[in-house]
């Protein structure tokens, strides 16, 4: 197990464009992270727009919305147009599109947004993908190489919410079969909550001084899938069993759920890497950036109890 600890940041006062002369664009508006970030921005009275392929500007949502499709360059200009009396968009939360070769598209949009006056980008990546690596790693490297812009890259480990969001396979297996499935064996990992990712994102999006670095975001404890099953059993009052699959069996399970073959192989490979110790590490980054400890899996499961029926 690797433990990395950073000195706590002093809390920054104010936002990077003072007097709210900023509007933040949240891509991936229907995803796990954007909704949590939106709540934090709304509470802080920071103007923002939520964007996704299915966003409807005329909807009754409490948030301003705009349509954005990574694959449709015609939406790029519209999504960067601020609403009503809002200031121009100065900051973007970048959530990668669900495609294999995502870097060229994301880099093209970053360039387009930069020409339109966007000054800061915060990228959602993954704990196992380093700068210069595949997919988001290429975007990470590009952001770090640009002069004249501010950036941060968030690299969270596996989400706790993968067990609780409505259409997640793990949630359905818990609810309907009293089982969870993995190819991680007895490997340990520090599951992190989307709520904690959002708190770090809020700081990197709004702090007056840009972070200009990447953060590996981990939960507070190393646990196995067997321990996840034990915790769920305790919280739910019924036995939840961890079914240990081979990598090939997990690929087949994911493909049977409708996942494209390339994505299924990639995710199953990441799962197997857990058994080899790829996620066996802890740090204090969440507290370092936000000033508060990340939530435990027990706390998460207790609050999400109703979702598993």
Swiss-Prot record:
Any single biological process term in GO: indole alkaloid biosynthetic process
Catalytic activity: agroclavine + NADP(+) = didehydroagroclavine + NADPH + H(+)
Matches recorded under InterPro entries: Ergot_Alk_Oxidoreductase (IPR051604), Ergot_alkaloid_biosynthesis (IPR019901), NAD(P)-bd_dom_sf (IPR036291), NmrA-like (IPR008030)
Keyword Magnesium assigned: no
Inducing or repressing factors: Strongly expressed in planta but weakly expressed in axenic culture.
Database matches in PANTHER family: PRESTALK A DIFFERENTIATION PROTEIN A, PTHR43162
The protein's role, per its UniProt record: Agroclavine dehydrogenase; part of the gene cluster that mediates the biosynthesis of fungal ergot alkaloid ergovaline, the predominant ergopeptine product in E.festucae var. lolii. DmaW catalyzes the first step of ergot alkaloid biosynthesis by condensing dimethylallyl diphosphate (DMAP) and tryptophan to form 4-dimethylallyl-L-tryptophan. The second step is catalyzed by the methyltransferase easF that methylates 4-dimethylallyl-L-tryptophan in the presence of S-adenosyl-L-methionine, resulting in the formation of 4-dimethylallyl-L-abrine.
Record's protein name: Agroclavine dehydrogenase
């Amino acid at each position: 197990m690797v433990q990395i600890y950073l000195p706590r940041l002093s809390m920054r006062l104010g936002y990077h464009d003072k007097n709210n002369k900023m509007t933040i664009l949240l891509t991936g508006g229907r995803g796990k992270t954007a909704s949590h970030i939106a709540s934090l921005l709304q509470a802080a009275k920071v103007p923002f727009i939520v964007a996704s392929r299915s966003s409807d500007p005329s909807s009754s949502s409490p948030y301003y919305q705009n349509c954005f499709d990574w694959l449709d360059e015609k939406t790029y200009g519209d999504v960067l147009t601020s609403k009503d009396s809002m200031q121009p968009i100065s900051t973007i939360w970048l959530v990668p599109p669900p495609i294999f070769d995502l870097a060229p598209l994301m880099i093209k949009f970053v360039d387009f947004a930069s020409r339109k006056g966007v000054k800061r980008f915060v990228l959602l990546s993954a704990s196992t993908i380093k700068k210069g690596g595949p997919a988001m790693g290429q975007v990470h490297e590009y952001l770090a190489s640009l002069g004249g812009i501010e950036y941060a890259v968030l690299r969270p480990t596996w989400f706790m919410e993968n067990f609780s969001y409505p259409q997640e396979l793990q949630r359905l297996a818990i609810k309907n079969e009293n089982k969870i499935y993995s190819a991680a064996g007895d490997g340990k990992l520090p599951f992190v909550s989307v709520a904690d990712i959002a708190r770090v994102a809020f700081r990197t999006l709004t702090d007056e001084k840009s972070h200009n670095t990447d953060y590996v975001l981990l939960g507070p404890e190393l646990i196995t899938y067997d321990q996840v099953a034990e915790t769920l059993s305790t919280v739910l009052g019924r036995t939840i069993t961890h079914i240990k699959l081979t990598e090939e069996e997990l690929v087949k399970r994911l493909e049977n759920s409708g996942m494209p073959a390339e994505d299924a192989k990639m995710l199953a490979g990441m799962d197997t890497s857990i058994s080899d110790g790829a996620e066996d590490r802890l740090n204090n980054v969440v507290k370092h950036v936000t000033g508060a400890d990340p939530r435990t899996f027990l706390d998460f499961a207790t609050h999400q109890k109703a979702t598993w029926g």
